[in-house]
Amino acid sequence: MVKVLIVDDSASVRLFLQGLLAADPGIEVIGTAADGDEAVEAVARLNPDVVTMDIYMPRMNGLLATRRIMETHPVPIVVVSGNLDAEEVASTFRAIEAGAVTALPRPQGPGHPNHEREARSFVQAVKLMAEVKVIKRWPRRDNPASLPSLPCQAMVPARLKAVAIGASTGGPMVLQTILAGLRRDFPLPVLIVQHMATGFIKGFVEWLNLTSALPVHIAGNGDRLIPGHAYVAPDCFHMLVTEDGTAIELQNTPPENGLRPSVSALFRSVTQAFGAQTVGVLLTGMGSDGARELKRLREAGAVTIVQDRESSVIHGMPGEALKLGAATHTLPPDRIVTALTSLAMEK
């Protein structure tokens, strides 16, 4: 049974979310809170498995409450956004920076044509967050260790042409770390698929640009791949590269692994376009999206990196890749930065 605490200043929203969640036999709503102060107290008293957190509340807002909870009684926090305007989405990513594990839009109410679908997705996502038993943070090293010597079969035979990264739950903070750590003269385009609820990608890219050494863009169909730029897959489209490897191709073909955009689609595409001249990176997240395709990328001669268990919020995707023998390296985020820099700067 997953124990959930609902935090929202609106009594009607609390009642709505409570009805959605309590209807699932695997969930028990153990309490509600109307502001951040109440939330901090309730977490300490009730010890929930998951907290759903509103952002805009009186007294202590959701951002401060998230920070306080993560300092005192760490628990998976899901930011629930009722309004996807720029200000609220920006605040949502500040809450993720403070320790929230993911963000979800609040489902539409009864009578809306999307209500049942959105409600099912919301409830399932909240339940899955209970798998995040401990919120981990990785140490920042002033002098990161150098990349271990590459095994012969992983040596890149020619100059690299692209980096492809896939991430899910816990990915935003890791991607922020990687993009902030790369040099401004990083000589490769970086292609990113981050699983995220619809409506948050624009704010996610804006948030990344606050700290990234590279310009970060929402990928557009036909965009030319420019070295030293990062491209994030947009909502509802698979992101591929053209056969000649010069541009981005967006496709609305069926979801893969239940997902669109899919990491699998990106990895398969870069394997075809670049082969061994790619670095593939699979970060924290649940499920197995991208794992088999990362193995194929390794078999093509590419360097393939997965995030280590200790620094992953959920080690599902990287763990599946390791089981398949898909990784040439298993590294924490700061050493992924070191590895990418070392590989890209090789002459």
UniProtKB/Swiss-Prot annotation:
One of its GO terms (biological process) is chemotaxis. Gene3D superfamilies: 3.40.50.2300, Methylesterase CheB, C-terminal domain. Its main location: cytoplasm. Residues 3-121 form the Response regulatory domain. Phosphorylated by CheA. Phosphorylation of the N-terminal regulatory domain activates the methylesterase activity. Contains a C-terminal catalytic domain, and an N-terminal region which modulates catalytic activity. This is Protein-glutamate methylesterase/protein-glutamine glutaminase 4. It comes from Geobacter metallireducens (strain ATCC 53774 / DSM 7210 / GS-15).
